[in-house]
């Protein structure tokens, strides 16, 4: 220990700890911490691991539900009962800062890490989704980031053998230097095969399994807990390096090891590596049984590089590693399974009953820390920051009169916007059909759906967030993120079940950012309570800022929602696109129309306006129930919600998103409003709570009857045609298209915007 640097306040501050936190550490230990102990505390008390600036707010979210098998934060991921002795494990997490400095590996290891969280619970990953944000595609650096992130996600997922079935991608200037890479994994497990991330049972051996430990990723958790800057490029060593083929072996070996019954507890080594897995598993054991702890000997840890210090071994975030607590006397069964798969499994310590995390290296005790003092809910600090509302300084749009506009040209221009245009270039790089459970190709249903083999059921899943709405109105925007996710799932015929979230915000020490965070969480909570979709867990990513106009600017607040839903009978699945000519087109929902927050307003007037669209959560809940009922009774042939771009874009997407079955439409919108901008609002408003369905003409009466029962306005606005597309308002044509015109505008605009030929 004498070779370690002298620990003092200055060194602690260099590790991201403040004076008060350093004093608390000294008080807990009753002495000055060793250098290794300082490193352990610095990562465990970082924002990334401790949630110290967010946990007080997160505790206000609904976390109870009849179908939940674990509460938020109890385990590596949420666990939801779906009947037939099956449960869904699912979670979403961010890998933003690593992807900003090393996009390929940053994104790839984000995929690997979230899948490990799922299979360490005993579940087999069956699908993944993503939610991505980048700056303007005009920026060469942004194009480099997009290319690296998309390839990283695709290469890791394809090699690992889990389909990437859905996601979203948006472009806004505020993400130029700070992209967001949020990845969600979904897995299935039989109830009796689940595993807890808990260390208990004095004398039970502790094993490290998987890849050897190197110097990659050291202080990755701390890196994720600070602002990005030009100097962040120097922190490429903080970005881990992934190996999907090693993870595939680790997956199969782990599920087989669990089947032996010899595994007591299991946790992924993600952020903070060996430090977080030992301390968190110890703390859970203490909480559940009253005593626990772990003692390890780092000399037994397989190291990738010579001369690694205790500090480096404890803080390394080398990928494809896990910590296992085995039943004493049966560890050889686990080791034999991993050996069969050519995966390392080594006993490095044991469970104790003195409530300590004890680390030995070269015959010395280099760390001896009360385990609960390290973790969220234990000794880790909790802060409530100042929150001050700061209204966006975006001007209201000065709308021009409808009669001066070319609505055909505007509609085609809107379809070619990167935020709306086809994302085929992205999802064609992902294998969405591996495992043969995916029901429809990407983009043909409002939420991805996979079949649950051995049953008639389907599992729907979606990620959603319109960050612009949250920027304009954090509370309403947070609620809309949940509402649209649930609406998308209900459009497939599935009932929304539960939520995981990934909360991406700026610096929490800035009062206006903390206000955005608190308000968005309040909106999310309101929506989840209304829909009975509890929060099962997730991730908070602060310190997301970019350099714009010579200063530091926070990203748009982006509380990404990941949601799952259950389709009782896969035969009742409803697709997004028109199914057959002659069907009636019905618009469900009739909110007051506004252009605030819309893509059209940004495109045409250079401002998002002054507020988000309004959201009526009671209406949304009834709309979800209606859609599920209509699907179960087979009364509708398609359903697609009205969102980005408004009704004109929704109709176009229903026409062209299925390239093998493109159909047209004739729509006539009734409008009693006499104002001179009514047509713009009819076509391009992103007012919430609306869905366009197509229905056999003979079933329209039954559909309207069901809608009336739930107080959902519904009216026929047109019909599906074999070819051509037209929109009229009050009988007056305002836009007519050939299907090929819609497809040309929508189909390859993203590739053109990204100048892919230059990559």
Swiss-Prot record:
Q: Which InterPro entries match?
A: PRibForGlyAmidine_synth_PurL (IPR010074), PurL_linker (IPR041609), PurM-like_C_dom (IPR010918), PurM-like_C_sf (IPR036676), PurM-like_N (IPR016188), PurM-like_N_sf (IPR036921)
UniProt pathway annotation: Purine metabolism; IMP biosynthesis via de novo pathway; 5-amino-1-(5-phospho-D-ribosyl)imidazole from N(2)-formyl-N(1)-(5-phospho-D-ribosyl)glycinamide: step 1/2
Under Gene Ontology molecular function, one entry of this record is: phosphoribosylformylglycinamidine synthase activity
CDD domains reported in the protein's UniProt record: PurL_repeat1, PurL_repeat2
List positions binding Mg(2+) 2. 117, 268
Q: What Enzyme Commission number(s) does the record list for this chain?
A: 6.3.5.3
- List the subcellular locations: Cytoplasm
Residues holding ATP: 51, 91, 501, 538
Active site residues according to the UniProt entry: 48, 95 (proton acceptor)
Q: What class of enzyme is it?
A: ligase
The Gene Ontology biological process terms listed for this entry are: 'de novo' IMP biosynthetic process
Classify the source by domain of life. Bacteria
What main location does UniProt list? cytoplasm
Positions with a binding annotation for Mg(2+) 1:
93, 539
Q: What does this protein do?
A: Part of the phosphoribosylformylglycinamidine synthase complex involved in the purines biosynthetic pathway. Catalyzes the ATP-dependent conversion of formylglycinamide ribonucleotide (FGAR) and glutamine to yield formylglycinamidine ribonucleotide (FGAM) and glutamate. The FGAM synthase complex is composed of three subunits. PurQ produces an ammonia molecule by converting glutamine to glutamate. PurL transfers the ammonia molecule to FGAR to form FGAM in an ATP-dependent manner.
Q: Which family does it belong to?
A: Belongs to the FGAMS family.
Q: How does it assemble?
A: Monomer. Part of the FGAM synthase complex composed of 1 PurL, 1 PurQ and 2 PurS subunits.
- What's the name of the protein? Phosphoribosylformylglycinamidine synthase subunit PurL
Q: Which organism is it from?
A: Chlorobaculum tepidum (strain ATCC 49652 / DSM 12025 / NBRC 103806 / TLS)
The upper taxonomy is: Bacteria, Pseudomonadati, Chlorobiota, Chlorobiia, Chlorobiales
């Amino acid at each position: 220990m004498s070779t370690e640097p002298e620990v003092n306040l200055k060194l602690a501050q260099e590790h991201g700890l403040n004076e008060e936190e350093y004093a608390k550490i000294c008080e807990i230990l009753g002495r000055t911490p060793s250098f290794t102990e300082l490193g352990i505390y610095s990562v465990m008390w970082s924002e990334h691991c401790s949630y110290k600036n967010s946990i007080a707010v997160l505790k206000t979210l609904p976390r109870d539900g009849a179908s939940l098998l674990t509460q938020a934060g109890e385990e590596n991921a949420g666990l939801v009962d779906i009947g037939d002795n099956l449960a869904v494990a699912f979670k979403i997490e961010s890998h933003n800062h690593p992807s900003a400095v090393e996009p390929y590996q940053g994104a790839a290891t984000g995929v690997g890490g979230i899948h490990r969280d799922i299979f360490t619970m005993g579940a087999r990953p069956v699908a993944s989704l993503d939610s991505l944000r980048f700056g303007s595609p005009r920026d060469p650096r942004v194009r480099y980031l997009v290319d690296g992130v998309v390839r990283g996600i695709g290469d890791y997922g394809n090699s690992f053998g889990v389909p990437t079935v859905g996601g979203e991608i948006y472009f806004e200037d505020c993400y130029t230097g700070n992209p967001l890479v949020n990845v969600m994994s979904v897995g299935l497990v039989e109830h009796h095969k689940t595993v807890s991330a808990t260390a208990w049972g004095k004398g039970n051996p502790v094993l490290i399994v998987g890849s050897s430990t190197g110097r990659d990723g050291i202080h990755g958790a701390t890196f994720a807990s600070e602002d990005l800057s030009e100097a962040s490029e120097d922190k490429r060593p903080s970005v881990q390096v992934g190996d999907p083929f090693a993870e595939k072996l680790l997956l199969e070996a782990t599920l087989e090891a669990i089947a032996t019954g010899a595994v007591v507890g299991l946790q992924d080594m993600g952020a903070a590596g060996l430090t977080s897995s030992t301390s968190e598993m110890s703390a859970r054991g203490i909480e559940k049984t009253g005593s626990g702890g772990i003692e390890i000997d780092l000399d037994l840890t397989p190291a990738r590089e010579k001369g690694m210090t205790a500090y480096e071994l404890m803080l390394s975030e080398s990928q494809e590693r896990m910590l296992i607590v085995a039943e004493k006397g049966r560890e050889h069964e686990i080791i034999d399974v991993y050996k069969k798969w050519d995966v390392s499994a080594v006993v490095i310590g044991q469970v104790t009953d003195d409530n300590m995390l004890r680390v030995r290296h070269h015959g010395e005790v280099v760390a001896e820390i009360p385990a609960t003092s390290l973790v969220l809910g234990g000794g880790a600090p909790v802060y409530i920051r100042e929150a001050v509302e700061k209204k966006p300084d975006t001007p209201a749009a000065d709308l021009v009169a409808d009669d001066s506009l070319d609505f055909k040209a505007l509609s085609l221009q809107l379809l070619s916007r990167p935020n709306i245009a086809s994302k085929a270039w992205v999802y064609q790089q992902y294998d969405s059909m591996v495992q043969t459970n995916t029901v429809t190709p990407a983009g043909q249903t409002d939420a991805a759906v996979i079949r649950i083999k051995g049953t008639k059921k389907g599992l729907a899943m979606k990620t959603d967030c319109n960050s612009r709405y949250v920027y304009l109105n954090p509370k309403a925007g947070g609620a809309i993120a949940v509402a649209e996710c649930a609406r998308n799932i209900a459009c497939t015929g599935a009932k929304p079940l539960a939520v995981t979230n990934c909360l991406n915000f700026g610096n929490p020490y800035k009062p206006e950012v903390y206000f955005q965070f608190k308000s968005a969480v309040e909106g999310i909570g309101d929506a989840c309570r209304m829909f009975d979709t509890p929060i099962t867990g997730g991730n908070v990513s602060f310190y997301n800022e970019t350099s714009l106009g010579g200063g530091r600017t926070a990203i748009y607040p982006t509380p990404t929602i990941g949601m799952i839903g259950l389709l009782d009978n896969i035969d009742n699945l409803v697709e997004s696109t028109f199914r057959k000519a002659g069907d009636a087109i019905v618009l469900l929902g009739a909110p007051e129309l506004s252009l605030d927050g819309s893509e059209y307003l940004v495109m045409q007037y250079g401002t998002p306006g002054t507020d988000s669209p309004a959201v009526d959560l009671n209406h949304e809940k009834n709309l979800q129930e209606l859609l599920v009922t209509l699907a179960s009774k087979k009364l509708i042939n398609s359903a697609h919600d009205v969102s980005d771009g408004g009704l004109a874009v929704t109709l176009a997407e229903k026409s062209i998103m299925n390239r093998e079955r493109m159909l047209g439409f004739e729509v006539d919108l009734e409008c009693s409003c006499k104002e001179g901008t009514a047509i713009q609002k009819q076509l391009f408003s992103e007012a919430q709570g609306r869905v366009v369905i197509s229905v056999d003409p003979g079933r329209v009466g039954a559909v309207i009857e069901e809608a009336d029962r739930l107080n959902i306005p519904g009216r026929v606005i047109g019909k599906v045609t074999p070819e051509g597309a037209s929109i009229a308002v009050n009988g007056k044509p305002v836009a007519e298209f050939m299907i090929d015109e819609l497809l040309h505008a929508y189909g390859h605009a993203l590739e053109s915007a990204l100048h892919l030929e230059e990559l």
